[in-house]
From Swiss-Prot:
Membrane topology, record value: Multi-pass membrane protein
Protein name, as recorded: UPF0060 membrane protein Sca_1835
Signal peptide span: none
Top-rank lineage group of the source organism: Bacteria
TM region(s), chain numbering: 5-25, 34-54, 60-80, 84-104
Organism: Staphylococcus carnosus (strain TM300)
InterPro entries (UniProt xref): UPF0060
Length: 108
């Protein structure tokens, strides 16, 4: 189960990092280079997600959505200094429970 978790984390870093760089370019008046690098990271995210071991696109992307939520909250805390409130934390916990419900059952 370590490999899928690492792929989810790498995908999240690519997607959130790419989106953040584009945000900085367009909303914080950073150099267009931020936008270009952000676009490259977003394309990389789409490629990294295909390395998942789960058989269906829908399950991979739905489960990744929960991971994305948690990582986005952590990204905001680390890079934007936005402390999550109790509702952010509770929502993230609910999402991870949903991810585990989707991915852990043996469907064979």
């Amino acid at each position: 189960m370590i490999y899928p978790i690492l792929i989810f984390i790498l995908a999240g870093l690519c997607e959130i990092g790419g989106g953040y760089l584009i945000w900085l370019w367009l909303r914080a008046s950073q150099s267009p280079l931020f936008g270009l690098l952000g676009g490259i990271l977003l394309i990389s995210y789409g490629i990294v997600a295909t390395f998942q071991v789960f058989p269906t696109f829908s399950r991979v992307y739905a489960a990744y959505g929960g991971v994305f939520i948690v990582m986005s909250i952590l990204w905001g805390y680390v890079f934007d200094k936005q402390t999550p409130d109790k509702y952010d934390v509770l929502g993230a916990i609910v999402c991870i429970i949903g991810v585990l419900i989707m991915l852990l059952p043996d469907r064979s």
